[in-house]
Structure formats: C-alpha cells, structure tokens
Amino acid sequence: MEGSDNTNTHCWICKDEYNVSTNFCNCKNEFKIVHKNCLEEWINFSHNTKCKICNGKYNIKKNKKSCLRWKCSFMYCNVPAICVSLICLLLLPLTILLVKFNLKSMLENIENRDLIALISAMAYSLPCVVGFITVVHILIALYDYYLAAKSDNTTYQVYEYI
C-alpha cells in the first residue's frame, strides 16, 4: 500500500480506494470504510438490515415498488406442484362425469336404497374434496410466490448516522 498513514482507505466490499469517512454503523477501522452504493447492494442482496460485525442497525429506508412494476421470476414458483394441481383441476370435471354415469348404471341393480344413498354421497363427495384440496394448494403456492416476489421487489436505501 502506498502512502504514509496506516489507515485502510479501501471499501471493505469492493476493495476500491475510498477517501470519504462515512458512518453507516458502529464499526471501527477498516470495516467503517465502505461505498454507499456497495453497502446498499450488499443489504439488498442479503436482506440483512444489521451489520454482521458490530450488530448495529443500519439507518435504512425501504423502497417498495408498486405491484404493477414488479419483476417476477419463476424461480420462486414450485412448478411441479402447480402442474400437478392444474392437472387435478382439469381432470376433476371428467372424474365427476364418469362417477355420475358409472354410478347410475351400477346402482340401478342394487335394491337397498340406504346403501345407494351412502355410495352416491361418497362417490360424489370424493372428487369435490380432491378439488377443494387442489384449489387450497394452488392458493397457498400463489401466496408463497407473492411473498417471495414482494421481498425481491423491495430495495433498501442506506443513510449515514449523524
């Protein structure tokens, strides 16, 4: 290192020279020297609003984009689970129709009316239960996707302590 003083004048993130003394947390010595842009990128990547060295909380402001300006990514999406759920939803009406026609012809031969009512109720309710569970699963997957996208579309702006 050139120069006569022993102080480290390099940003601890990008290692470029930095001559301005800013105070974003309680760190001393070389960890105190950091570019504002480098620190903001670091915080936006890690989503950690506290310094890992001194545990001091950064003076930050959250900037949330409006939902219409979000950048969405399929990397948060559980694609196999959503595909299985959509296939179940597509097969649901077909299953109900098959149950209806096959059950009707099968039950015409049975004389006990109470047994017929019980079998009918079970046969019709099972596809409905599967459909309900599938819809709930899709809603949960969409909510998880929303939370991940919301987190990814929030940026932090750091300010110096005064």
UniProtKB/Swiss-Prot annotation:
InterPro entries: Znf_RING-CH, Znf_RING/FYVE/PHD
Amino-acid positions noted as binding Zn(2+) 1 in the UniProt annotation, renumbered to this chain: 11, 14, 35, 38
Top-level division of the source organism's lineage: Viruses
Entry's localization field: Host membrane; Host Golgi apparatus, Host trans-Golgi network membrane; Host early endosome membrane
Binding site for Zn(2+) 2: 25, 27, 51, 54
Lumenal topological domain residue ranges: 100-121
Swiss-Prot/TrEMBL keywords: Host endosome, Host Golgi apparatus, Host membrane, Host-virus interaction, Inhibition of host adaptive immune response by virus, Inhibition of host MHC class I molecule presentation by virus, Membrane, Metal-binding, Modulation of host ubiquitin pathway by viral E3 ligase, Modulation of host ubiquitin pathway by virus, Transferase, Transmembrane, Transmembrane helix, Ubl conjugation pathway, Viral immunoevasion, Zinc, Zinc-finger
Class of this enzyme: transferase
Substrates-to-products reaction catalysed: S-ubiquitinyl-[E2 ubiquitin-conjugating enzyme]-L-cysteine + [acceptor protein]-L-lysine = [E2 ubiquitin-conjugating enzyme]-L-cysteine + N(6)-ubiquitinyl-[acceptor protein]-L-lysine
GO molecular-function term, one example from the UniProt record: transferase activity
Transmembrane segments: 79-99, 122-142
GO BP: symbiont-mediated perturbation of host ubiquitin-like protein modification; symbiont-mediated suppression of host antigen processing and presentation of peptide antigen via MHC class I
Zinc finger (RING-CH-type): 3-61
One Gene Ontology cellular component: host cell endosome
Coiled coil: none
Enzyme Commission number, as recorded: 2.3.2.27
Cytoplasmic topological intervals: 1-78, 143-162
Membrane topology: Multi-pass membrane protein
Similarity remark: Belongs to the poxviridae LAP protein family.
Function (record text): E3 ubiquitin-protein ligase which promotes ubiquitination and subsequent degradation of host MHC-I and CD4 molecules, presumably to prevent lysis of infected cells by cytotoxic T-lymphocytes and NK cell. Binds target molecules through transmembrane interaction. The result of this ubiquitination is the enhancement of the endocytosis of the target chain and the delivery to the lysosome, where it is proteolytically destroyed.
Domain notes: The RING-CH-type zinc finger domain is required for E3 ligase activity.
Protein name, entry field: E3 ubiquitin-protein ligase LAP
The organism of origin for this protein: Lumpy skin disease virus (LSDV)
